[in-house]
Amino acid sequence: MARIAGVNLAIQKHVWIGLQSIYGIGRTRSRKVCDAANVAIYTKIRDLSEPEIERLRVEVGKYVIEGDLRREVGMAIKRLMDLNCYRGLRHRRGLPLRGQRTRTNARTRKGPRKAIKK
């Protein structure tokens, strides 16, 4: 099992799919990492040699990922909440931020229905 950026990658998957299990790496970035590391994207992770894994580690290390990225996102949200701007208030109340309707729908963001007491 290959370990990159503190994440164990599933050995039966292709490299570009396996890299997507790292927080902060999606489809596009995964392919860019493979190209930069000179690794074929359809190679299975179990078939990678140690030098190839090391090249992938170096390329992945150039990006903000995993814990650092989670911290950055959390701090950006906290900053909005501290500013008392509209987006910060919506975050604080657990409502949608980007103008979606809330009279109906928005159940994912608002959570389960609360019964109205009569």
Swiss-Prot record:
Residues 95-118 are annotated as: Disordered. One of its GO terms (cellular component) is small ribosomal subunit. GO terms for biological process: translation. GO terms for molecular function: rRNA binding; structural constituent of ribosome; tRNA binding. The keyword Lyase does not apply. InterPro entries: Rbsml_uS13_C, Ribosomal_uS13, Ribosomal_uS13-like_H2TH, Ribosomal_uS13_bac-type, Ribosomal_uS13_CS. The keyword Ribosomal protein applies. It comes from the Bacteria. Transmembrane segments: none annotated. Keywords: Ribonucleoprotein, Ribosomal protein, RNA-binding, rRNA-binding, tRNA-binding. Belongs to the universal ribosomal protein uS13 family. Part of the 30S ribosomal subunit. Forms a loose heterodimer with protein S19. Forms two bridges to the 50S subunit in the 70S ribosome. Located at the top of the head of the 30S subunit, it contacts several helices of the 16S rRNA. In the 70S ribosome it contacts the 23S rRNA (bridge B1a) and protein L5 of the 50S subunit (bridge B1b), connecting the 2 subunits; these bridges are implicated in subunit movement. Contacts the tRNAs in the A and P-sites. This is Small ribosomal subunit protein uS13. It comes from Xylella fastidiosa (strain 9a5c). The lineage of its organism: Bacteria, Pseudomonadati, Pseudomonadota, Gammaproteobacteria, Lysobacterales. The gene is rpsM.
